[in-house]
C-alpha cells in the first residue's frame, strides 16, 4: 500500500520511522513546507512544497497521514477528498470520523477521512470505555500532562482544538456528556506522559479485570502503563491514572503522547489495508474483544 505523510514536525517524523518498519507499506512522500533540517532515511523522498505536491501529483498514494495542524488539515482534506486519497488525520480538526482503534474501528467502512482525535483522547477514551462498562458515569474529568519538549509548534497552535475535540469524542464515543479536559505542559524535558481520570458514579464496583484491560491495550500501544489503579477517593468519585512511554523509534521515551497517537494511526491504517484487501468481515468490529463490549 502506498502511503504519504504531510507534516514533518515531531509527530510526522516519528510516524515516518514507525512506517518504514512495515514491509507492506511503500512511503511515497514525506512532505513539508520548508527545507528539511533533520536527517531522514535515505530511501524516503522529501518534498518541501506542502499540499502543492499532492495537487501536482494526483492520486500518488492510497493513504495520507496528515500531521500538520487543525487549520491546515481543513484545507488539505479538500485536496485529498477530490483525489480519492484516504486521509488519516492526526490533528484535532474534527473533520473526519472520530476514531479510537479499540472502540470503533468499524467506522472505517465507507468513509474517506478518519480523525485520530488527540493524544489525550487516544489514552483516555479506552480507559473511559472500560470504566463505563463497569459503572455509570455522570461526570468525567481528564487531566493529561506532557513534556514541553514534545509540544511542537502545531501542538501549541492546537491547544483550544485539543480540548474541544477530546471533549467531543468523550461525549460522542463514550456517551458522557458532562466532561472536562485539561492539558498541562510541564517545562521539564523528562516528564512522562500521564493521564489521570476522575469520574463521578453512584455505583460501587470492583475493577477486577483492570490489568487485563491494560494488557490488551498494550497490543498496539506498547508503552501504555498503569500508574494508579481505579480507586474510590470519595464515595462517589473514582480516580485512575496511566502513563505512556514512547517506543523511542525517533523521539525519547518521554514522548509517549506523540507515540500513542502515531500507534493508533498505524493501527487504523492496518485496518484500512485489511478492508481494501478483503481480509475482514465488513460488519464486525474486530477490536470489540479488547474491551469485551
Regions found by a protein language model. Name each.
Residues 1-143:
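N-terminal Rossmann-like NAD(P) cofactor-binding subdomain of oxidoreductases
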Residues 34, 146-149, 287:
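Short, conserved aromatic-histidine micro-motifs
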Residues 233-235, 277-281:
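A short, charged
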Residues 238-241:
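A generic structural motif
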Residues 269-277:
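Short, hydrophobic alpha-helical segments
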Residues 279-291:
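Short, highly charged C-terminal tails/helix-capping segments
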Amino acid at each position: 500500500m502506498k502511503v504519504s505523510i504531510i507534516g514533518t514536525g515531531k509527530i510526522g517524523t516519528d510516524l515516518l520511522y514507525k512506517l518504514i518498519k512495515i514491509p507492506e507499506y511503500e512511503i511515497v512522500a514525506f512532505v513539508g513546507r520548508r527545507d528539511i533540517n533533520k536527517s531522514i532515511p535515505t530511501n524516503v523522498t522529501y518534498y518541501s512544497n506542502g499540499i502543492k505536491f499532492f495537487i501536482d501529483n494526483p492520486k500518488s498514494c492510497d493513504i495520507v497521514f496528515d500531521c500538520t495542524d487543525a487549520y491546515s488539515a481543513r484545507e488539505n482534506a479538500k485536496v485529498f477528498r477530490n483525489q480519492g486519497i484516504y486521509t488519516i488525520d492526526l490533528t484535532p480538526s474534527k473533520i473526519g470520523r472520530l476514531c479510537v482503534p479499540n472502540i470503533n474501528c468499524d467506522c472505517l467502512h465507507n468513509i474517506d477521512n478518519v480523525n485520530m482525535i488527540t493524544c489525550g483522547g487516544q489514552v483516555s477514551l479506552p480507559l473511559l470505555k472500560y470504566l463505563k462498562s463497569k459503572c455509570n458515569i455522570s461526570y468525567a474529568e481528564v487531566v493529561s500532562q506532557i513534556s514541553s519538549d514534545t509540544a511542537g509548534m502545531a501542538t501549541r497552535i492546537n491547544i483550544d482544538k485539543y480540548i474541544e475535540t477530546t471533549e467531543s469524542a468523550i461525549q460522542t464515543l463514550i456517551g458522557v456528556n458532562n466532561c472536562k479536559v485539561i492539558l498541562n505542559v510541564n517545562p521539564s524535558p523528562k516528564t512522562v506522559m500521564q493521564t489521570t481520570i476522575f469520574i463521578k458514579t453512584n455505583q460501587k464496583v470492583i475493577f477486577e479485570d483492570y490489568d487485563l484491560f491494560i494488557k490488551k491495550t498494550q497490543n498496539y500501544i506498547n508503552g501504555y502503563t498503569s500508574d494508579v489503579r481505579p480507586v474510590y477517593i470519595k464515595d462517589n468519585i473514582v480516580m485512575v491514572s496511566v502513563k505512556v512511554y514512547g517506543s523511542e523509534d525517533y523521539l525519547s521515551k518521554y514522548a509517549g503522547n506523540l507515540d500513542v497517537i502515531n500507534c493508533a494511526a498505524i493501527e487504523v491504517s492496518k485496518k484500512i489495508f485489511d478492508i481494501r484487501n478483503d481480509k475482514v468481515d465488513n460488519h464486525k468490529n474486530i477490536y470489540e474483544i479488547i474491551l469485551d463490549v
